[in-house]
């Protein structure tokens, strides 16, 4: 079968004050021999590999071990989750063809880039090139994501697959924490990421660093003296980011308030992980998870941890000297083993769905850093997807990815056909359902069948159908709730409070999504539900970032 050669562009080296532009992998068909793509599923990931089976298994095993270690700091329940399995694409480094550089040069010429004045230089990553010419090199590890999915691409060196030499990047963990819904409490996100920045992997364990404290540490005598103010803030100040006044005991003159809060948040997370022989970990996880749904309160803290804020402050103060002076190690009590998983030759459909989805994700990434090359990436994604489509594959997953590819490429007309066909064949991913709902709403608005230029009940139901399918999947998408609100705003059918409760759900998930808050407030005002409307108006006034937006909510309050 043809070889898909991995090509990675790094744009021309700019003058000294400018940096090169790194572009993601570009997979080009070449008439060369090579091993087949292999397919498998493990630890929730869907795997497409161009490596030998033994290397593939070593990578997946290492991936599994790293996530097991991460679970000691960040359990799966507190990470981003999706109904769409994340993709792991592996490519053997030794399959790089010698002609790769020339292919890239030709593509850059077609994009009107400067013609290099030197020949192809494999391995030229360490060479200093003329400023007018492009440099090319492999990008060995890249993660891209959509609103409902994620994909990881790795170039694998056969002799360097060792979990003790690998780690999960800060960027990856930052994504897992910040994209998790409902949103995790800010103190936990800040504290965990502050610690994770310097956390080290090795020997089957995590080494968590000492807390970088912002002021001199208290002595043992000071900690025991009730006349000496506590060296740590009260729990409400930490949990709710209520910073003490500068120059006070809690915030000495010259201390950075943000760094002081981060230090407290890191101390609280570190205490939850380590203190009293890790006795508080399960309770801390429960408190964090429930806080994301219910909000933070002392009653919840007491229920989960067994004591209140004052006692927690005392314990944090006693723990501070330990946390600020030494690191500590975390490892699973009983290391889990990855269950065996089969690897089989990937079908044309599997290659198209996985590789095409990856290439689709590359397009907006490239558009943001080198817009003139984005059409080349879009063309390649379309070719990959079309290859299976032209062989009469009509799978809902393939059609959904093709539809999203056209949406991202700006062709809603083509996208609509693929998305409708996908939805008719079976369940599709949440973003595909959301985009189908958006396109159906646009059509209904352009051809309203209801009274007074509104869409009628049949149109309303048809638009809501894919939106509610998306709502039932993970992750929740704010656009889904905004579209549901727009449907009710455009419909000649009056929604009940039960219907509107779905929009309430969206606001709880996305309280800072000002467009959604505004739509909710307008609907409740329009339909005479004053109490609920006032709650959304007050929220909008709190989270609005400019005066024109605040003026909109003030006008709603006056209606």
Where is each model-derived feature located?
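Non-catalytic architectural context of zinc metalloproteases
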Residues: 16-165, 180, 200, 247-261, ...
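Beta/coil-rich, acidic/histidine-enriched accessory regions frequently appended to metallopeptidases
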Residues: 19, 291-448, 528, 532-535, ...
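Acidic/His/Gly-enriched intrinsically disordered linker/tail segments
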Residues: 32-33, 121-152, 180-340
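Active-site recognition of the HExxH zinc-binding catalytic motif
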Residues: 44, 166-179, 190-194, 269
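Alpha-helical repeat scaffolds
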Residues: 377-386, 414-422, 451-471, 495-507, ...
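Short coil turns that delineate tetratricopeptide repeat
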Residues: 393, 427, 475-476, 511, ...
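Alpha-helical adaptor scaffolds
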Residues: 404-407, 435-445, 453-458, 468-505
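Terminal, low-structured helical/coil segments at or just beyond the last alpha-helical repeat
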Residues: 506, 519-522, 526-559
